[in-house]
Swiss-Prot record:
This is Chaperone protein HtpG. It comes from Vesicomyosocius okutanii subsp. Calyptogena okutanii (strain HA). It is found in: Cytoplasm. The gene is htpG. Residues 1-334 are annotated as: A. Transmembrane segments: none annotated. Keywords: ATP-binding, Chaperone, Cytoplasm, Nucleotide-binding, Stress response. The lineage of its organism: Bacteria, Pseudomonadati, Pseudomonadota, Gammaproteobacteria, Candidatus Pseudothioglobaceae.
Amino acid sequence: MTIKQTHSFQTEVSQLLHLMIHSLYSNKEIFLRELISNASDAVDKLKFKSLSDDTLIEGKEALQIHIDVNKDANTITITDNGIGMSEVEVNKNIGTIANSGTKKFLKSLNETQAQDSNLIGQFGVGFYSSFIVSDKVEIITRKAGSKSKKGTKWASTGKGKYSIESIDRPDFGTSVILHIKKDEKEFLDDYRLRNIISKYSDHITVPIMMVKVSEDNKDIEYERINKANAFWAQDKQDLKQKDYDEFYKSLTYDLEAPLTQLHNRVEGNIDYTSLLFIPSKSPFDIWEPKRKGGIKLYAKRVFIMEDNEALMPLYLRFVKGVIDTADLSLNLSREILQDNKVIKAIRKASVKRILSVLEKMAKNKPEDYATFWQEFGMLMKEGVVEDTINKDKIAKLLRFTTNKSKNATQTVTLEHYIKNIQKDQKAIYYITAETYETAKGSPHLENFNQKNIEVLLLSDRVDEWMVSNFREFDGIQLKSIAKGNLEDFDSKEEKKAKEEVAKNFEIVIEKMQKILDSQVKEIKISSRLSESPSCLVADENEMGGNMERIMKSLGQDIPDTKPILEINPTHSLVKKLKTKIDEDLVKVLFDQAVLSEGGQLKDPAEFVKRINKLIN
């Protein structure tokens, strides 16, 4: 490129800039945190790449971040001698947002949510926070290893367009030049900037340098502002909870302190240090398939990578922290890392340690565990299926609400359920539904409520998948009360009475079957109902109604099966059918059963007509 070219910002970038400028006015200082974080990443990348290509680092200059203030020009310049960017990378990374998850996030973000500056850092678009305090921003950069001494200059006022041109730049790395707005000159104050660095970036491992203030102002000498140490390498005996909380916040951009942390130094066959945090709040993008992981991997304090499932199983993706080992080759590729014996051993030990801490929390700090479960319970339900090695440990950490619970809060353990099981009960019973209210009001529960049998009410979006794969606990089978035949809790007298009733309804059932033949597989007398007239049941090995609805919502094909309609012979509506088979009433009984399990009618208007007709 030899001439300046002008481009328009991508729509999402313009939206982001608008949100930042108008919504982050109460926390403007975060611009420096974001730019220092980007500079630190650039230095870490150069360190890593230079391990396999020492020509990338020119000369013996220390890798640092410099912050320079020019009050006459109203500028702040943040310079790093990290990896730098090529012209192609500038075009790709600045002015556009390629990540689909980020685009989706921006589309849903409103101005109130945008006031949470940590969302900006978590999504990796923090550079644009520069425009909160600047009316013009310039980037001058040159890629490390580039044979040409030419660099790339990017410039914008943040008003819809930006320019790119080629310029001379003898050194590799990146400089970000902020032209500070007239009403933001407080950020040109040396003391103010040092305070911001101390607040947000003290634990950045790259030295952050500023000009040392001297009395004669003649000699320009730089001094390090941040501690620039590996926080996790410190002895935990020397650290206070406040220190951990501050490091956690600087690492994760979380405003809240973590629930707890695990700080361990392991020496033996494998030497490593791990500092892992369990957050108190779930990130908003926890269900994004391509979200970044929370564990950073270091080898001898050299940053290697993050966002690698080799470091932590998917169900523990909420865990944040650092793992640093001396027993890892520094030139491992991401692919090789997956099968590395050292990483596998560290991962196994870390998972065991995390589950142990959660177990102790549940026992000794139930309020903290209740907070954890509310935020991350669904992920633990993933884990009981995915982690076959630790399945039993995870199962003991699960919490549920039941038909005996006062509300939807999940507090009941499987151990508690078994302890209070009925004398002749052979299964752990559950029902799945789209909502807690639908589960709680399900007609399938009626006989269980009457006989004081506890039933798990499952309405989390992972529950159907969990019970399809997690089928027994402590030797006792988990069984849906909306599927197949149930064990009989009736007395001999009750059984005999029901058998007599069933015989009296044989002709009624035959006639009902003809009317509903295209909609149901079978009609039979129910052992589940005591108050409602009807309910739908699936065969033992077939998909239930709730699972069918979930699959349909995901656009998945489902097997062409029909449910079983169960009727309650003691209900007045069903008794009417013994006198006369009313086709409208039969169809209403079926539609009512569909609605009671949270389903949707194919023709609601026709249902209303039938109801009105029956009422009249």
